[in-house]
Amino acid sequence: MGAAKKPAAAGVSTKAEREADLVMETNNSSIVSKRSVELLYYPKPHFFRYFVKRPPRRSPLINRGYWLRMHAMAESVRQFMKQPSDKPKFVLNLGCGFDPLPFILLSTDKSLCSTTRFVDIDYEKLMVNKKTAIRRTDEITRLLENVEFLSDESPIQIRSEQYLAIGCDLKNLKKLDDVLKTELLPSDCSILFLAEVSLTYMDVKSANAVLAWASKLNNDSQFCILEQFFPDGPNHPFASTMMKHFNKLGAPLYSIHEYRSLSEQEQRFRNAGWAHAQARSLWDLWSDNEFVGSSLRAWLDTVEPFDEWEEFALFASHYFLLVASTKPQTMVQELQKTPALTTEPDISSQYVLLAGNNPRGGQRRFGALIPDSENSMGHHSGLGRQTRDVSTDLYSTCKGMTTPQLPFPPREVSARMCHTVTSLRGGDCLLVGGRASPANAFQDCWLRQGKQWQSTKSLPAPRFRHSAVKITLETDSESVLVYGGKSSDGSIFDTWLLWQTHSNGWQEVEIQGARPPARFGACLESINQTTGVLFGGIGSDGIIIEDFWIWKIRHRSDGTVFLELTDHTEHLQQTPLSQYIYRFGSTVTRTSRGLVIVGGIIPRQIVPYECEIMLLDVGELLEYVENESSWGHRILSAIGLGGILQGARPLLVGHVACAIDPDQVLILGGGAVCFSFGTFWTEGGWVLKPAGSTAQNNWTLVPEAMHTPEPVASPKTPQISTALKLSSIRRIRVDTSEQFQQILADGKPVIIEGSDIGPCTELWTKEYLTDVVGSDRKVVVHESQSENMNFQAKNFSYVTKAFGDFLDEVHAGGRQYLRSISAELPSKLPANLAADFPGLKDDFKLPQALSLVTENAHSSPLRISGPVTMWLHYDVSSNTKQEGWKLRVADRYAQVMANVLCQIRGERRLVLFPPADVQYLQVPPGASSSTIDIFQNIKDGSIVSIPHTSPQEAVLNSGDILFIPPMWLHTASPTGGVSVAVNVFFRSLPKGYAAGRDVYGNRDLQAYEKARIDIQKMVRSFDGLPSDISRFYLLRLAQELKDNAGV
């Protein structure tokens, strides 16, 4: 599917051909995504590459989803080929598209394929194109014996001993039947039909005709079909998003409306003449060790960092694999199916879920709640519409409220997700860990105490997706208990850490008795001051853990504490609803009625509507535990989404929740990327309340501009010094390339003046740029509420707007900044002034003396800035090999970047720091940007005075060129008016391994990234030793690193 169009064949209506073309177009995205999977996960030789022109890179979610689809189909074929039989075997792929599955199996499982012949079947014109691609590919034809390429008019396009390609519309079953019986199939053989998301594009009557025909073609046939279904109805947010996507493409799904459930699909096949049919969701198959082994699941995480578990489960729960057979026994063993849904005891009628107003904004996932007052709450950081958001949304029930009662986290707390915030007495709270990317976990912790935020003792190791709960020890001191989580290198923790308000940092808690397996994303909550429950989470084998523990923290006479854990899984399984409590990414909130469990994902199936919210009766639980009696059915009840859902169904993943009243729960945020179909956001605040309550949902979002947090002072933050004298960067003229090469060799910044950079210095006025670029051209700009943009704090927004509007606003004093990105492929290609702004390319040039820059150019972004300062950072970038880039380190390399900054219009002031100063500039591990705002006061030009540093200053006028050597940290500030400039980044040093593609020039060398992971492993090697001994040896190792760095 996915061929270029040809004139309509005789007898085929124009409408029918258009519909066929739309169906074939669905193959384009699919085959590209499979190529992405092949690049990362499959050993060579690769075969998708011959059908996909450009080497793609899909997101980890798309990669894992397609990996599972590909594995499901390939594993089904392997199981068929492994079945003992004296008959010849045939694998008929109905609607094969450009999928090269036969060639992959012939290459990797040659002996297994010895008695099997593969037959690809699809539209005539698609198979003509597939034939052309195969004919010109020696790597494929060498796998085939006695291969023949027949004419385009022939029903058989390719014939060989192992493989045939047939062009035939599946609605023309007579033609297909004749070809197979006369040209291919012997009277006695075994057949496996494959249909991977192909029959569902046919009308139901035609698709069912294919199934009935296939069941009668041979008395030893099996059918393997992979398609979408509705595990929880078409109104589920993922399902509705998926259907809108396919309808928008003009290729709607048909069978899914007629056969919504797995049981209906199984009955469909039995009605079509198949003796046996078994359907299972891909999420169910993912957890089956016979289908996807635990070691294989664990290996996937070593290929690329992955943390899109909720979205992966949603996708896999909406696709099924069905295997049917003409014989009573199927080719796969009969496995235990998911039990039928039971919701008893059902208390949904006792609750109501109230939807709030849907304001513009407030869209964030995987954030954390910040306590404020009885009538207000903050939703901090998390993942916004485009990136992680450093801000905190203020929700309030008071109409006149504009600012929080207590301070929200300052911008020094870098944007993060999957972190925790635990409420303490008097409005205090503790923020712990989190992550940027899954490979960049945070170790820092922040305490709000006495209405002020301050950095507190960091975690022993970075972690995210951990669980945290407040406990009160016998000394009446408040503490925070943290369990589990995941680190940057993929390690999963089973440790319990204790933070106490009056102690120095974190201590690992000793465990007595059984120890729960390591996990992340678990459900942890207290049921009194020192006792609580633990359940769910994902373990090291990539599946949700189905257990239930009760923990109790105890004191010894010497003041130390230990944790006592008891496994009550068997007791819980006596209750009818136990299968729905084992969750990942759920919230657990303590209320007067018990623990309210909201959303998340569960093993093997989607969370059904009736069990989205559940109630664990704490009183019943404690009674059963104390009396050691059997657990009754009342301990766990289903609330669902209440008796009557008011509003559209929310998607309860990535959300946050808290008790706002003894028996009311507030739910904020959430949503998910619904695979490749679009993003669904749960907006506004939702309130779960008892049905008899008269309370209303008055929670609304307060506009962010009213409560933007100010930075707080920290003992480590440098203070402003207006008396600081900066050394000026020298100005020189450069007339020859030899002179510039000497500048490179010196490795010091210089301002090159008197060079000809083209007529841009005169032409690029506001009016000229608007006319040439186009007033309506869409650009993405940084829009800031502050005059100091901070990349770590993400105190700005990415806003898409018309270029003309941007110029109007920035010339009117708007705090905006444009750093152009690739117009064609912004996520894959670096900015290129000539390609992105062709109308400007003849206006700008580099002088001949800088030919080395032109010859080694990486990117050339256009920069237009108003009265706003840039963050302090350094530049380093990765690039791609010609044959296509891969995630594996050995296949990619980085280039340390130098750059020349060409000032076109206006004036710009820059401050630069030499590489050796980086240790004093508060650049977080793994980052290339500092947290310090160098320009603390734009009006008087003062900058921070930082001990042990040697800042240098450059003031650029129109026509000046600033050479910035590699690793020199730099920041820029306007000196009045609008600044227009062009950067040209170029490769100035030998190759070094990279951490990945970076079109913006801000990613570090792989050697550094790898070393950071090694440091984390080094720290963990001292686990179990007394803290003073661990500290002693870590300090010795730190000194060795300093010695090697020459410090």
Curated annotation (Swiss-Prot):
GO terms for biological process: tRNA methylation; wybutosine biosynthetic process. One of its GO terms (molecular function) is tRNA methyltransferase activity. This is tRNA wybutosine-synthesizing protein 4. Its EC number is 2.1.1.290, 2.3.1.231. Probable S-adenosyl-L-methionine-dependent methyltransferase that acts as a component of the wybutosine biosynthesis pathway. Wybutosine is a hyper modified guanosine with a tricyclic base found at the 3'-position adjacent to the anticodon of eukaryotic phenylalanine tRNA. May methylate the carboxyl group of leucine residues to form alpha-leucine ester residues. InterPro entries: Cupin_8, Gal_Oxase/kelch_b-propeller, JmjC_dom, Kelch-typ_b-propeller, Ppm1/Ppm2/Tcmp, SAM-dependent_MTases_sf. The keyword Acyltransferase does not apply. Pathway: tRNA modification; wybutosine-tRNA(Phe) biosynthesis. Keywords: Methyltransferase, S-adenosyl-L-methionine, Transferase, tRNA processing. PANTHER family: TRNA WYBUTOSINE-SYNTHESIZING PROTEIN 4 (PTHR46529:SF1). Belongs to the methyltransferase superfamily. LCMT family. It catalyses: 7-[(3S)-3-amino-3-carboxypropyl]wyosine(37) in tRNA(Phe) + S-adenosyl-L-methionine = 7-[(3S)-(3-amino-3-methoxycarbonyl)propyl]wyosine(37) in tRNA(Phe) + S-adenosyl-L-homocysteine; 7-[(3S)-(3-amino-3-methoxycarbonyl)propyl]wyosine(37) in tRNA(Phe) + S-adenosyl-L-methionine + CO2 = wybutosine(37) in tRNA(Phe) + S-adenosyl-L-homocysteine + 2 H(+). The gene is ppm2. Residues 814-1003 form the JmjC domain. The keyword Repeat does not apply. S-adenosyl-L-methionine binds at residues 69, 95, 122, 169-170, 196.
